[in-house]
């Protein structure tokens, strides 16, 4: 099995990249110190930088091809290229499921004004939609206006409530905090379980320093 793919019971998960930028860990975690980060040499790169990852997880479950989040679509974004290299083709995607609606999770929703995944339904957590579409929030959220609201005009959105059953093996469970409507995806198949966490945590270092919260957390 390729290193970018794992199975959880009958469910196949394929990790797809949209890029691996580096940055100072003090940018997302301004209340920490470089000395604290140096306690985790396996996380550190040159010049006291840490790696980041944009991308998606492709999931095959119950005869469906599902994409969890759609990356950032920066100028140097590679999501489409990496998907095709790993045998994941946009025109075959049945469902696009969002853990939340931050810019680096909705970037490839549309291409040239049309849904990037043409036959897919786009599943959005209802609570996150309610938050991001508030007038006082959406006016400052260009990514919502450009990459999320047009999906409604295309008629491809479905909303997920609490414990939303995506397939018999996948459930969207509420994990608020990073955003008010954030969800994680529980995979439960053939006695095996795993989670696609979304942005519940941003670094393995948070398992040690459990009080570290990145500036991106809304709550």
Placement of each model-derived feature along the sequence:
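Metallo-beta-lactamase
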Residues: 88, 92, 116-174, ...
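Conserved beta-strand hairpin/beta-sheet module of binuclear metal-dependent hydrolase folds
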Residues: 2-85, 184-198, 203
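Active-site metal-binding motif and surrounding structural segment of the metallo-beta-lactamase
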Residues: 75-123
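Short glycine-/acidic-enriched loop or helix-start segments at secondary-structure transitions
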Residues: 25, 77, 107-109, 133-134, ...
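Active-site neighborhood of phospho(di)ester-bond hydrolases with catalytic His/Asp-centered motifs
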Residues: 67-70, 94-101, 123-125, 174-177, ...
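Residues that act as N-cap/strand-start positions at coil-to-secondary-structure junctions
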Residues: 51-53, 160, 179-181
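Short secondary-structure boundary/capping segments
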Residues: 5, 49, 58, 113-114, ...
């Amino acid at each position: 099995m390729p290193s970018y793919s794992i199975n959880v019971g009958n469910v196949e998960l394929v990790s797809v990249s949209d890029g691996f930028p580096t940055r100072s860990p003090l940018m997302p975690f301004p209340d920490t110190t470089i000395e604290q980060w140096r306690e985790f040499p396996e996380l550190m790169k040159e010049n006291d930088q840490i790696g980041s990852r944009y991308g998606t997880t492709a999931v095959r479950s119950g005869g469906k091809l599902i994409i969890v989040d759609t990356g950032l679509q920066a100028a140097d974004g590679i999501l489409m290229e990496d998907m095709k290299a790993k045998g994941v083709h946009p025109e075959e995607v049945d469902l696009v499921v969002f853990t939340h609606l931050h810019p680096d999770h909705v970037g490839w929703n549309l291409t040239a004004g049309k849904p990037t995944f043409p036959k897919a339904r786009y599943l959005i957590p209802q609570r996150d939609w309610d938050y991001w579409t508030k007038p006082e929030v959406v006016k400052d959220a260009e990514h919502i206006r450009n990459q999320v609201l047009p999906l409604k005009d295309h008629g491809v959105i479905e909303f997920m409530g609490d414990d939303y059953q995506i397939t018999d093996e996948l459930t969207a469970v509420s994990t608020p905090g990073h955003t008010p409507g954030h969800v994680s995806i529980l995979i439960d198949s053939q006695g095996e379980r795993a989670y696609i966490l979304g942005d519940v945590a941003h670094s393995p270092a948070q398992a040690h320093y459990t009080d570290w919260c990145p500036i991106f957390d809304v709550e």
